[in-house]
From Swiss-Prot:
InterPro entries: RNA_pol_sigma-70_dom, RNA_pol_sigma70_r2, RNA_pol_sigma_r2, Sig_transdc_resp-reg_C-effctor, Tscrpt_reg_LuxR_C, WH-like_DNA-bd_sf. A motif (Polymerase core binding) lies at residues 29-44. GO terms for biological process: DNA-templated transcription initiation. Pfam families: GerE, Sigma70_r2. The gene is sigS. Keywords: DNA-binding, Sigma factor, Transcription, Transcription regulation. Belongs to the sigma-70 factor family. Residues 126-145 bind DNA. This is RNA polymerase sigma factor SigS. GO terms for molecular function: DNA binding; sigma factor activity. It comes from the Bacteria. It comes from Staphylococcus aureus (strain MRSA252). Sigma factors are initiation factors that promote the attachment of RNA polymerase to specific initiation sites and are then released. Sigma-S contributes to the protection against external stress, thus playing a role in cellular fitness and survival.
Length: 156
């Protein structure tokens, strides 16, 4: 399917997401980033998958927009940290608690479990993760249960 067709049918998803998150400042910049992401997603979409193109785009664009918000928050935190630094020549260090905990959890996991967790956090569905990792869905369920057990032990 050509991108012009995808755009004509699904461009309202971008407007909906921007309205959903009350984006008025930098609306055009966010719109352009989401439009580029829509083009990328239209290139990787497989019509044979169980998910319709509109739900695929909506879900992935929604997660992408949330990631953009997180990146913007990190940038603002870094700028604030730099402005309040006692010595301006000293490079401020930024620690995100989420990233630090994720690193600690990943240290407990084997390669398959780490790969599953990263794909899961990126928003992939179970059957998509199974395709990407070339495993059966039952194996993915076992990996998920193992990660869940390890995380529960870690956070107790």
């Amino acid at each position: 399917m050509k991108f012009n067709d995808v755009y004509n049918k699904h461009h309202k998803i971008i407007h909906h997401l921007l309205k959903k998150y009350n984006i008025s400042y930098n609306y055009d910049e966010y719109y352009q980033l989401l439009l580029i992401k829509m083009w990328q997603l239209s290139q990787i979409y497989k019509p044979s998958s169980n998910q319709s193109l509109s739900s695929f785009l909506f879900m992935r664009l929604n997660f992408y927009l949330i990631d953009l918000f997180r990146q913007q928050k990190r940038l603002n935190d870094i700028i604030l940290c730099e402005n309040h630094s006692p010595i301006l020549t000293e490079q401020p260090t930024y620690f995100n608690e989420y990233d630090l905990r994720l690193q600690d959890v990943c240290a407990l996991l084997n390669h398959r479990e780490r790969q599953w967790l990263m794909l899961y956090l990126e928003g992939y569905k179970q059957y998509e993760i199974a395709d990407i990792m070339s495993l059966s869905t039952s194996t993915i369920k076992l990996i998920k249960a193992s990660v869940k057990r390890k995380c529960q032990r870690f956070f107790k």
